[in-house]
Amino acid sequence: MRHISSLLQGLARSLSVGKERKGGDGDDGKAAAATATAVLRTSGTLWGEGSETFAAVCSRRGEKGINQDCSIVCEGFGCEEGSVLCGIFDGHGQWGHYVAKAVRESLPPALLRRWREAVTLAALIDGGEKRLCECRPDLWRQSYLAACAAVDAELRASRRLDAVHSGCTALSLVKHGDLLVVANVGDSRAVLATASPDDGGGARLAAVQLTVDFKPNLPQERERIMECNGRVQCLADEPGVHRVWRPDREGPGLAMSRAFGDYCVKDYGVISAPEVTHRRITAQDHFVILATDGVWDVVSNEEAVQIVASAPEREKAAKRLVEFAVRAWRRKRRGIAVDDCSAICLFFHSPPS
């Protein structure tokens, strides 16, 4: 109940300010910054003020030029003490790094604005706090869907950024009390580390994948693309790498089925709609890893969980994982340029004393 009560109080303050200001999601960015007690946009760490959460972030440039990955961690997101937003974005194409940064800056305020609207409307329709608590997951889902649609439309209308042949993936989560909401657009991945009984009567950390890697060859993705007259094919020199192609051209081919930008293939089945899932965090859940495909291409879910769990200090957990991935690239994929590798490790509880 405390989460909804304090949230509604924060919304009242925010909405009273909003009456004095008109504008779109870009203008709302200032309000979003004001409601976050701390924001981390680079490699580093961030302690959760008033909570037990702790985030470690690391990104390493690959061998393909500029690092097109970027990330954000917002503590105190949505006017709520202990609420956290994490996001990781992977650009592609000539201007992919700009697209990734644009989405990183636009998505949090767009999401916050839709969340405010959804909660306010729900309170007017059925003002009971119990009912609001019950419908929180669905409100977050609605907010994410609306926010991602708005961000993609804003990006398409932008005169400052060419996102026709460039785009980015976006994986983000909101921790709101014991509720964890995860939204995924593209092929980055979120993996939860949770305690599971082992054969010896003790406990081990198990890896639970929370997201789907949205590749074009997934049955539901391929079906949508084909219905929109797009093609899903592999190049002769890239066996196993399925790409989305326009029906009348050979390139460029997109290696994921969901993304922001990439308007050259948006009419052929590529979408920016996220898959939104949720779960309740328990005492058995230790941390969650958000990482770009540069990490997951060479590191298994189980390996990632063990690497993070075995870090001598939480501050070095993300760095340890990313550096392991870079070494794995050079060992497993010799002759292939190392991809950008980025990770966020969000710990839910204080370390044991």
Curated annotation (Swiss-Prot):
Keyword Magnesium assigned: yes
Reactions that this protein is recorded to catalyse: O-phospho-L-seryl-[protein] + H2O = L-seryl-[protein] + phosphate; O-phospho-L-threonyl-[protein] + H2O = L-threonyl-[protein] + phosphate
A single GO molecular function term of this UniProt record: metal ion binding
UniProt domain PPM-type phosphatase: residue ranges: 54-348
Binding positions for Mn(2+) 2 per the UniProt entry: D90, D293, D339
Gene Ontology biological process terms, A to Z: regulation of intracellular signal transduction; response to water deprivation
One Pfam family hit: PP2C
Cofactor: Mg(2+); Mn(2+)
Keywords: Hydrolase, Magnesium, Manganese, Metal-binding, Protein phosphatase
Family named by the database record: Belongs to the PP2C family.
Keyword Nucleotide-binding: no
Entries under CDD domains matching the protein: PP2Cc
Stored InterPro entries: PP2C (IPR015655), PPM-type-like_dom_sf (IPR036457), PPM-type_phosphatase-like_dom (IPR001932)
Top EC class for this record: hydrolase
Note on how the cofactor is bound: Binds 2 magnesium or manganese ions per subunit.
Lineage: Eukaryota, Viridiplantae, Streptophyta, Embryophyta, Tracheophyta
Organism of origin: Oryza sativa subsp. japonica
Protein name stated in the entry: Probable protein phosphatase 2C 48
